[in-house]
Design a protein with these regions (language model features):
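C-terminal catalytic domains of large/alpha subunits in multi-subunit enzymes
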Residues: 1-250
Length: 250
């Protein structure tokens, strides 16, 4: 895939499939380059060492060939016996099964007894998405996913009137979490490589947001355990909690 022409973004779990294809193609390309360099240097493939963009003879590093020169040689028909012209490789990858990520979320939730306002005091995540290609992106993905999940659990609600007209059509009516609604998070990354792809990846596209609503609901139920309520709907707005405590309010 010509990366400068086609881009699919870094969302979802594209790196599991697309990244694996790139890795396999890169390995095949390097093997081709080593084979071609060995023939150009007149040595065995095992005697060739790659140093960045230079291929050298292990026993005599002065004997070398630059990658650019190697690419020019590779473009010539018959440049090396048994090597197709061109310094390129194509590889297709189809995973044999889905590589599932896993994790556990813990939340500290407080409910104001007078206003029924829920406050999140802390959030902890232990997460295993396989090998981390870019830990910074993974960290940001989980933080953003938790914030998204908190919005679903506590704020975001689509409402309609009796005529079916939306009542939450603007950001004045449709509540989203603000920065002060998102607590500090402690995220622990586990790296258990998946055997289902060459890079050991599992993906981190959605797993950070899926447990949030459930763990917040469980924490609120625990906080209000003396009242004997059971949370079965989101979001847990003060009005919703008041209705749970006093169903006669409708």
């Amino acid at each position: 895939m010509p990366g400068g022409v086609v881009g699919t973004g870094d969302g979802g779990t594209r790196v599991v499939v697309g990244g694996s294809a790139v890795a396999l193609a890169a390995r095949a390309l390097r093997a081709k380059a080593v084979r071609l360099a060995a023939q150009q240097l007149g040595v065995a493939e095992d005697d060739v060492q790659q140093n960045g963009t230079v291929f050298v003879e292990r026993a005599n590093p002065e004997r070398r060939i630059e990658l650019g020169r190697l690419a020019a040689v590779a473009a010539m028909a018959g440049a090396a016996h048994g090597v197709a012209p061109g310094l390129e490789a194509t590889h297709y990858f189809q995973p044999p099964d889905i590589a599932y990520a896993s994790g556990a979320h813990v939340v500290l939730a407080e409910v104001d007894a007078d206003t029924m306002q829920v406050r999140i005091g802390g959030y902890w995540v232990s997460h295993d998405s396989g090998r981390l290609i870019n830990p910074t992106i993974v960290e940001g993905q989980i933080q953003g996913a938790v914030a998204l999940g908190l919005g679903s659990a506590l704020f975001e609600e689509i409402r309609y009137d009796a005529a079916g007209q939306p009542l939450t059509a603007t950001y004045m009516d449709y509540a989203l979490p603000r920065s002060d609604d998102v607590p500090p998070m402690q995220i622990d990354h586990l790296e258990t490589p998946s055997p289902l792809n060459p890079l050991g990846l599992k993906g981190v596209g959605e797993s950070g947001t899926l447990p949030v609503a459930a763990v917040v609901a469980s924490a609120v139920e625990d906080a209000l355990a003396p009242r004997g309520i059971r949370v079965e709907q989101m979001p847990l707005t003060p009005a919703a909690l008041c209705r749970l405590l006093r169903p006669e309010l409708g």
